Amino acid sequence: MKTFVENGITHLDLHGVRHHEVDDLVLVFVLRNQDLIPLVIICGNSVKMISLTKSCLDFNAIKYQDIRYGLIRVEKI
């Protein structure tokens, strides 16, 4: 997991993260950086990683948008 800022937007890169870690990492990232929304989560090409990330966001009623395949932008908590 890596976080970085690009073009003024904070990103979470999930490359190398194990599937069972996704829920906690995504939720902590969003809550810690909620004052910096929009945020971007990079899931990569893994269908499973994208699904796990979206499930976490949906469960916690966090609004998001697919920017393109493997990239999710958090819009609102």
Task: Write out the residue ranges for each language-model feature.
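Long, charged, low-complexity intrinsically disordered regions
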Residues: 1-77
